[in-house]
Amino acid sequence: MTSIIKLTTLVGAQEESAVCYLLQVDEFRFLLDCGWDENFSMDIIDSVKKYVHQVDAVLLSHPDPLHLGALPYAVGKLGLNCAIYATIPVYKMGQMFMYDLYQSRHNTEDFSLFSLDDVDCAFDKIQQLKYNQIVHLKGKGHGLSITPLPAGHMIGGTIWKIVKDGEEEIVYAVDFNHKREIHLNGCSLEMINRPSLLITDSFNATYVQPRRKQRDEQLLTNVLETLRGDGNVLIAVDTAGRVLELAQLLDQIWRTKDAGLGVYSLALLNNVSYNVVEFSKSQVEWMSDKLMRCFEDKRNNPFQFRHLTLCHGYSDLARVPSPKVVLASQPDLECGFSRELFIQWCQDPKNSVILTYRTTPGTLARFLIDHPSERIIDIELRKRVKLEGKELEEYVEKEKLKKEAAKKLEQSKEADLDSSDDSDVEEDIDQITSHKAKHDLMMKNEGSRKGSFFKQAKKSYPMFPAPEDRIKWDEYGEIIKPEDFLVPELQVTEDEKTKLESGLTNGDEPMDQDLSDVPTKCVSTTESMEIKARVTYIDYEGRSDGDSIKKIINQMKPRQLIIVHGPPDATQDLAEACRAFGGKDIKVYTPKLHETVDATSETHIYQVRLKDSLVSSLKFCKAKDTELAWIDGVLDMRVSKVDTGVILEERELKDEGEDMEMQVDTQVMDASTIAQQKVIKSLFGDDDKEFSEESEIIPTLEPLPSNEVPGHQSVFMNEPRLSDFKQVLLREGIHAEFVGGVLVCNNMVAVRRTETGRIGLEGCLCEDFFKIRELLYEQYAIV
């Protein structure tokens, strides 16, 4: 590679967790995904926090929380402020994921890590792209381009291709699926040939995946047996990703008369179910060819479900007759409707629970998958209840004090506003009278006439007192007081109003009362529960299996491979398989957590800082699209707080900028420099956190004194072709023609290419010889 490429694993290395990586390409830093696990581990936030202000762009691959869950927190709390790129479905469905996740947590606990406003603020920064749309970055990212390609895992799921200067190709492909499904086409990774670097995951490297037909039959059998036994089926799914595949599959099964399921109910239960289906209807062009043909030929939207009932809460679900199949979020059973239904239904042997997703280890769903024989578990029961008794009275008193304080503050502001308005009016009147006094044109006679001897009779006009009330205005116009528009019969007294606000009304409570309108608190208890219902894991994750992953990597033949996101044994298995079929042609890296991989293959490329005095003394010569200069300098090693930097070794230096390449002739301080490096490494190594976050050893190139500058032979670059040089000679009026591969000029000078590939000039020392030599020199960049 001709660029500096580094990858730092912030989250998701040698483990099954969220994914988040920092990719450095020269001076530009990408944050590849920004995921958060189901338990909202703050270790993930601490890892992201160290680098959040260095990030220049964020690339999101999938819409689920494991790929973008930490984005609202990073934007709202950590100050992440950069361009964020994602496909249109990832933008829309990602919002649905985060809305549902927040509401699921908020319904049963005091959740304050991020708010819905943080979600909106984060997603407002996203630049929405289409598949195969090439985006050329600007500024620090000049020369870089990014392209989203279909991943086949979720709607809008992306494989990112990053290209540097049309040469180096970096492919970021995690959680991809090459198989065609009902609602999605598979990815086409094999079309990418010989990338410089491939970053992929090993989540399924050792997983043996059953055939799709076998999984569908298992699902249908489970559902039929449970429903015919008068039981309910809970299918734990995500919010807006893989749930679309299951919804399509089940709705098609329900349409089939032979299945005999038409008499049973099918429901989708999450906080944003209606929005998810509506967004899906408008994104058919992102889905499989089969669904698109159905939509184009029959003009029938595939997400206009016939049998699937959309529910937003338990009251909606209660109206769906039993027995029923319920697709409920979240897939981890840690929160949301799926957890509540699991607690209600798991103690009835008639019911069935189907898990479709291997979530992070430590979650309830993953525990049930890994320990299918465990029938007694301790589970935390969380719920939000209304305040009662003393707690309610204290809450009402606090709210009353808050309202009084807010009212006083508002009144003081209004008083200040009135006084300022009155003073403005007085100033205006004073200004008018002063202007009248100064004005000497169009003066009436009464104003200048002196009083006469006889009293003049004045005509008086009777008037009623008319005090003028000043109307309050703000940015939106006149301020409206709601009490002015109340109907007298509907007005309530202050006591009744207080009772209504505090929830102390007489009579029965409504069955589906919204707890957000009354004061509540969250309570939790731990109970031991016996699982009597049938719990089954059926794989509908939508990922490629281990053998397919290995075949795809073998077809791509990447020069370098970085394996992330997977258990240690799966990571090692995939690495060994890739080394076996790739041999010496592939470098395989298996980084650990918080480890940085240097994927720069050219070992003579380094980053150095140039002194201004050195840059001002350089003499550049143009060579094609670049400018070259010879540098004579001395290296100074020191610790400096900068964003980038590389420890210099005793090798040739070559600094490549945006528009120039510099060939460096350096005098490296042999023993002293190496010793200094070792001392600095020992003093400010990885153990010292004060310097390990941003500080690195930066080689600074300083100019040599003029009396110490060594001479050097001229370097000829940009070798011309003889055919092109012939055209140059003809334009200058010199007759030139090829004779036996030798360019003969005016029958006096011969220009030939030697066996070593260099151009030689032969002939008598005449005026033509020196003119032709000068023209030949002009074709080179001489440094």
Swiss-Prot record:
It comes from the Eukaryota. Residues 407-416 have a biased composition (Basic and acidic residues). One of its GO terms (biological process) is mRNA 3'-end processing by stem-loop binding and cleavage. The keyword Cytoplasm applies. SMART domains: Beta-Casp (SM01027). One of its GO terms (molecular function) is RNA binding. Residues 407-427 are annotated as: Disordered. It is found in: Nucleus; Cytoplasm. Keywords: Cytoplasm, mRNA processing, Nucleus, RNA-binding. One of its GO terms (cellular component) is cytoplasm. InterPro entries: Beta_Casp, CPSF2, Cpsf2_C, CPSF2_MBL, Metallo-B-lactamas, RibonucZ/Hydroxyglut_hydro, RMMBL. Pfam families: Beta-Casp, CPSF100_C, Lactamase_B_6, RMMBL. CPSF is a heterotetramer composed of four distinct subunits 160, 100, 70 and 30 kDa. Identification in a complex with cpsf2, cpsf73, cpsf160 and sympk. Interacts with sympk. PANTHER family: CLEAVAGE AND POLYADENYLATION SPECIFICITY FACTOR SUBUNIT 2 (PTHR45922:SF1). Belongs to the metallo-beta-lactamase superfamily. RNA-metabolizing metallo-beta-lactamase-like family. CPSF2/YSH1 subfamily. This is Cleavage and polyadenylation specificity factor subunit 2. The gene is cpsf2.
